[in-house]
């Protein structure tokens, strides 16, 4: 079966977009997602995004990481979907329904309300998620938040100085996090401005992570480090994050189409 795809990215976090809203595709498996995402033998991406019909929203977005695992949310992919769809829409995800819309220079996404209770992260046992009483070497007392998917956020003096490539895997897979965890290292760079590096669950180091930017901004706001509108700069660029009066997280930032093509599904199944 010959299948069309669109390659897109949000601040360098890149996606293979597959649209099954009008015409069904074969079932997506972990093996197929891994094969498509492979940068040497496949098309190559951080996530495979599958758009499907939905009974509860305008359509459904499914997200498969490069390791083949299906995850709940992806902020950068949500902006890419907004650009691809071309108009405002409510989108069903495994993490809940989000609202997307094209915006000047990219897209705007209402990521919904963050969750802070330890069961929602989830953690293996009860802890204060504003400051977990745990540490990994020089990294201590992170905040934890679920913004559709689970994150821990460490605030340090210099985010660039932390060897996240070596520390990330151990934190991601720590038994404290039964569903694994996304790891964020952040430092304040000015009034309502943060620098961020992210080890993404199932992906590794990434140039940008939209949900990571949301989680980090919310953690900074909860700790009184910033106001309720924050600029978060990642290696791939900057996102604007707002925690609005209704406690919804609003993310605004760029997305772009890279190219389009086709592939034979059988080659990747």
UniProtKB/Swiss-Prot annotation:
| UniProt-recorded Gene Ontology molecular function terms | diaminopimelate epimerase activity
Q: Which organism is it from?
A: Erythrobacter litoralis (strain HTCC2594)
Chain sites annotated for binding substrate: 13, 47, 65, 75-76, 149, 182, 200-201, 210-211
Q: What is its EC number?
A: 5.1.1.7
Q: What NCBIfam families does the annotation carry?
A: DapF
Q: What is this protein called?
A: Diaminopimelate epimerase
Q: Which reaction does it catalyse?
A: (2S,6S)-2,6-diaminopimelate = meso-2,6-diaminopimelate
Task: Provide one Gene Ontology biological process annotation.
Answer: lysine biosynthetic process via diaminopimelate
Known Pfam families for this protein?
A: DAP_epimerase
Cellular location(s): Cytoplasm
Q: Which family does it belong to?
A: Belongs to the diaminopimelate epimerase family.
Which residues are annotated as active site?
74, 209
Question: Hey, where's the site called Could be important to modulate the pK values of the two catalytic cysteine residues on this chain?
Answer: 151, 200
Gene Ontology CC: cytosol
Coiled-coil region(s): none
Query: Which pathway does this polypeptide act in?
Result: Amino-acid biosynthesis; L-lysine biosynthesis via DAP pathway; DL-2,6-diaminopimelate from LL-2,6-diaminopimelate: step 1/1
Q: Which UniProt keywords apply?
A: Amino-acid biosynthesis, Cytoplasm, Isomerase, Lysine biosynthesis
HAMAP family with a match to the protein in the record: DAP_epimerase (MF_00197)
Q: Does the keyword Amino-acid biosynthesis apply?
A: yes
Instruction: Kindly state the subunit structure of this protein.
Output: Homodimer.
Superkingdom of this entry's organism?
A: Bacteria
Give the protein's function.
Catalyzes the stereoinversion of LL-2,6-diaminopimelate (L,L-DAP) to meso-diaminopimelate (meso-DAP), a precursor of L-lysine and an essential component of the bacterial peptidoglycan.
């Amino acid at each position: 079966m010959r299948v069309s795809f669109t390659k897109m990215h949000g601040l360098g976090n890149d996606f293979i977009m597959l649209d099954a809203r009008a015409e069904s595709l074969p079932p997506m498996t972990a093996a197929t997602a891994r094969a498509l995402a492979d940068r040497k033998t496949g098309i190559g991406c951080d996530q495979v995004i599958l758009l499907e019909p939905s009974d509860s929203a305008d359509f459904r977005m499914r997200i498969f990481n490069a390791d083949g695992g299906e995850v709940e949310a992806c902020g950068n992919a949500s902006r890419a979907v907004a650009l691809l769809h071309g108009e405002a829409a409510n989108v069903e995800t495994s993490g809940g329904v989000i609202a997307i819309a094209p915006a000047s220079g990219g897209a705007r996404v209402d990521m919904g309300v963050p969750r802070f209770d330890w069961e929602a992260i989830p953690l293996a046992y009860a802890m204060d998620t504003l400051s977990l009483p745990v540490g990994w070497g020089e990294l201590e007392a992170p905040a934890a938040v679920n913004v559709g998917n689970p994150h821990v956020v460490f605030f340090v003096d210099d985010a660039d100085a932390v060897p996240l490539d070596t520390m990330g895997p151990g934190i991601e897979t720590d038994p404290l996090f039964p569903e694994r965890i996304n790891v964020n290292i952040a430092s304040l760079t000015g009034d309502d401005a943060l620098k961020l590096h992210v080890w993404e669950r199932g992906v590794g180091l990434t140039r940008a992570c939209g949900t990571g930017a949301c989680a980090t901004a919310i953690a900074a706001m909860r700790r009184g480090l910033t106001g309720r509108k924050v600029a978060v700069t990642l290696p791939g660029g900057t996102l604007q994050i707002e925690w609005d009066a209704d406690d919804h997280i609003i993310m605004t930032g760029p997305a772009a189409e890279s190219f389009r093509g086709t592939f034979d599904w059988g080659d990747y199944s």
